[in-house]
Amino acid sequence: MMQCVVRAGVALALAAGQIAMAQEEDADIRSAIEAERQLLSEQTRRLEEQLAEYEAQQKRLDELESRLSDDRIPEVEKTRDEADSGVAPERLETGDNETRDSHEVMTAGDLAADDFVGSWPMFGSNYRMKIGGYVKLDALYDFDGTGDKTQFLIAQIPVDGSAAAQRDGYFNMFARETRFNFDVRQSSDGGPEKQLFLEMDFFDESSFSPRLRHAYAVYGNLLFGQTWTTIADLASLPFTIDFGAGDALFGTRTAQVRWQQDWNETWSWAVGLEDLQYVGIYNPNSLPGEATTKLPVLAGRVTKQTSKGRASLAALVQELRWDGQGLGPNASATGWALIYAGRRNFKGGDFWTWNIAYGDGTPETIMALTGSNANAVLEADGSLTTRKGYSVALGYGHRWSDRLMSNFAYAFTDLENLGLGQRAPDAIESGGVGHANLVWQQGKFSAGVELMWGQRDNADGRSGDATRIQAMLKYGF
């Protein structure tokens, strides 16, 4: 009897153990099932986000395709018709390849309104990214031995009687204008629009290393970093194959902080504090010290833009200073400039452009005079005398067909003559460059040929002229 009881107890214990093990296995299975459910739920959520992003992108593509419908009339033709239809003004749209640098700085509302075609979502965030740029091959023949073998610059035109004037013509082929950029933007989340933009090319004078062109951030209407100066209006420049683009132009890229805002659909304004890259003081008497500045450049611009064109009025004020460093004189002066620029569209796709600038103590901002100490003269008595200068750049674009167009441009600059000894004898005092080209374009691919002629006058009265022909193959992406 006792043995039976023991056996029954053992059996019950074994059964209880088996039940406990089964319960533990059941709990593990339930835990695994719950983990799989959570993983599946997370994957479903991500798929739904990607699907929503895909649908939004498809909607943007559909909107773009609808713009291009209308019996497949090219977009440039639509813009052309709207410009002459008398409809309410809209923002000016320019086709690819119409300006040498098509990148336009946008803030706030303009960023929100931009379609950002070609971008893709950065999954896990509300940012989108786009990679752009172009590959460009240039081949040129210079008839007069111009100093720069990659761009046609007034300062590099040989003058009569110089050793450079004895140089023969030459051929050159290069791809240094090739560039690439990264554009990152944040989709609207109820806050300010945001953008990061970085662009490089290979136009470094001493090597083929990448060279920084643009590096800036936008937060709403605030921009900070390096890009075109606030006073620059790229729409006022016709397309040229030559990278120099007729360097009697006012404005360059510089470090800055800028506020840029639309008043309405037609008017916008911008104001910025910028780095003064070249103080530009000529020291003919070799007085001790150096050119410097204690203040940033103050620049501003007002722009009117419609479907028929655009016009902008800009101004800048800057300080010029000579620091005697305890050994020479201390002196300061103020420089200023006014710039009127714009573009006017005509029926048939033609347009004309203008960029007119005049200033006192600011000629170094004219590209042809940059680095030539053209802003002011340090007199023997230690005072600063500012120098006046102006530049005029005019252009006309004519469209022969949807794929073929020509551009004609002339840019001229002149610097005030302050008298004998007030400028280095071999420095530029005036000069100009003309361009005429024929460009064929299909989609992102373009090819063209350009003839250019330039003339230079030095402070010592010597002058020279040069001629160059240049061809290109270019593919944008």
Predicted feature residues:
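Detector for outer-membrane/organellar transmembrane beta-barrel domains
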Residues: 303-423, 428
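N-terminal signal peptide c-region/cleavage motif recognized by signal peptidases
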Residues: 17-19
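Outer-membrane beta-barrel "beta-signal"
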Residues: 440-442, 465-477
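Surface-exposed extracellular loop regions of Gram-negative outer-membrane beta-barrel proteins
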Residues: 175-197, 300-325, 405-409, 439-442, ...
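N-terminal periplasmic/intermembrane-space "pro-region" immediately following the signal or transit peptide
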Residues: 22-148
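Sequence/structural signature of outer-membrane beta-barrel proteins
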Residues: 142, 187, 201-207, 231-233, ...
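Outer membrane beta-barrel
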Residues: 117-279, 294-295, 299-307, 343-347, ...
